[in-house]
Each structure stands twice: as C-alpha cells, then as structure tokens.
C-alpha cells in the first residue's frame, strides 16, 4: 500500500500536533519519513481519542463513550490492524501499513496503549521509577518503534532509542505540569511533592510556583543522562535518520533548558523554540550525527531505567 492520502493526513497531523518534531521530520529520506509521520499520526490519534480531543483541542460535542470504552475501541482496532482487516480510519490504515512494512511487534503497540490505560485508570506515581514506567509506555516504546522503522534491530541501539523517548517525556512533563494539573493529571513522583511540602491538590497553585520550579528542574536534570545515552545511539542509525533524530533531540532538550531557566515563570506561557533556534540546532545536529560515527561510545550506564525485554 502506498496511499498518498495517508501521508497527507500524517503530514497535517505532525504540522499541527508537534511543531518541535516537524522540522526534524523533514530530514529523513522519503521512505523513512512516510513511515515516521504515519506512526506519529497513529500515536497522536490514540492520545486524542482517550482525551476526547482533536490534535489537542477539546471536542465540540460531549463524549458519547467513557474513556474506558474509548480505550477498548483503540485496542480492538489495533488488533484488527494486525489481523489484516481493512482499516477505514486514516490513522489506523497508516499504522497498519507501517506495522506490516517494518515488522513492528504487537507487544510494542500494546505497550503504547498501556500508557493511555494508565491515564484512564488514574495510575499513581509514588517514586521516579513509577514516572519513568509511564514515560516508557507513552514515549519510550514509540522510540523503539521509530528505531525499527529506521532499520534498527540490535538491542543496544534500541535501548538508546528508548532512552530518547524517556528524555522527551520527562521534558514534556516538566513543560506541561500546570496544564496537566488543570486536566486532572499528575505525573510527578509523590515523594518529590512531599519533599517540597506539596500534595496533588495544591502543587499547581500559583503561590507554589517556586517549589514547583524546583521539581521541574529535577525533571529536566533527570532527563540529561537519557539525552546523553541517546546521543551514543546515533551511530546505529542511517546518516539522514541520525541527523533527524539528533535535531529532534536538540530541539526538545532546549525546551527543557528553557523550562529550567524560566523558573517560576515557566508556565506563564508554553515553552518552545523559535524558528531561528530550530535552524541553529539543526546545524549543530548535523555535526553531532557525523561525529557520533567517529568515536567510541561507553556502554549504557547501568543506573538508567531499563525497558522491558
């Protein structure tokens, strides 16, 4: 299957859903880019279905199903896609094409859906490891699927791809702490809140911004070794893919830096990168993609969170 309309749908989804990744996605070769965009479209669709949104915006009509029912629908359609059924929704038709073309294991897809299940059942996060497990399901396993699209099959490089997903999600959580709180979700370790004298009821209140900024700084700093680990994985990717991934890494890491630097004002406006900043980071990433091939990399640190094998 090579349906142009599926690619158009995926391009539109990326353009609206993730301006941070849209620039990086242009660096892939055409075949890889198609699959990357279509996998992203499926991930975004699943996220929106659970939240009863369209590309992050609230649905105009009240939900006709409960979150539990919507999750069951996603699971059913994912099983149908793997079974070879004709998929009529663009996001699932796109996913079916990608999964079949790149031999993406059903376990990865359902690991991703487990992240949405954690939201639906309002999972609790006591320690950082609990938060990292959530990060794995919503982003780390996406890194695994993306790496497979790029031809990666060895576990060492897959570990690094998962690490990048973990870093991205830690950055996401830091950036979106207040928005998530308004949506009734908290991914912060309860032990961290307790350390700052906060709880799930008051942590996002304006008067607690100073303490919240310290928690955000911890998240950003926790992401650093995962970004560093991901850098070591660039050598395992085709060069253009390495450039694209290095660009995404640089852009997203910069968002975390901005959250940390903004301190108490981090949530006055959504932290993002400007077009000139993206272009500067893109150029820096080209050098990183090249130099990653020219030096030996140390083994992955043993203290990092380990994905399920």
Curated annotation (Swiss-Prot):
The free-text function statement in the UniProt record for this protein reads: Involved in the biosynthesis of carotenoids. Catalyzes the condensation of two molecules of geranylgeranyl diphosphate (GGPP) to give prephytoene diphosphate (PPPP) and the subsequent rearrangement of the cyclopropylcarbinyl intermediate to yield the 15-cis-phytoene isomer.
Q: How is its activity regulated?
A: Inhibited by phosphate ions and squalestatin.
Where do the record's region annotations for Disordered lie?
Answer: 290-309
State the Pfam families in the record.
SQS_PSY
Q: What is its EC number?
A: 2.5.1.32
Superkingdom, according to UniProt?
Answer: Bacteria
The UniProt entry's sequence similarity note says: Belongs to the phytoene/squalene synthase family.
Q: Which InterPro entries match?
A: Isoprenoid_synthase_dom_sf, Phytoene_synthase-rel, Squ/phyt_synthse, Squalene/phytoene_synthase_CS, Trans_IPPS_bact-type, Trans_IPPS_HH
Protein name, UniProt field: 15-cis-phytoene synthase
**GO: which molecular function terms?**
15-cis-phytoene synthase activity; geranylgeranyl diphosphate synthase activity; metal ion binding; squalene synthase [NAD(P)H] activity
Which cofactors, if any, are listed as required?
A: ATP; Mn(2+); Mg(2+)
Catalysed conversion reaction? 2 (2E,6E,10E)-geranylgeranyl diphosphate = 15-cis-phytoene + 2 diphosphate
Enumerate the CDD domains for this protein.
Answer: Trans_IPPS_HH
Question: Gene3D superfamilies recorded for this chain?
Answer: Farnesyl Diphosphate Synthase (1.10.600.10)
GO BP annotations, alphabetical order:
carotenoid biosynthetic process
**Cofactor binding note of this UniProt entry:** ATP is required for the transferase activity but it does not seem to be hydrolyzed during the reaction.
Which keywords are on file for this protein?
Carotenoid biosynthesis, Magnesium, Manganese, Metal-binding, Transferase
The pathway is: Carotenoid biosynthesis; phytoene biosynthesis
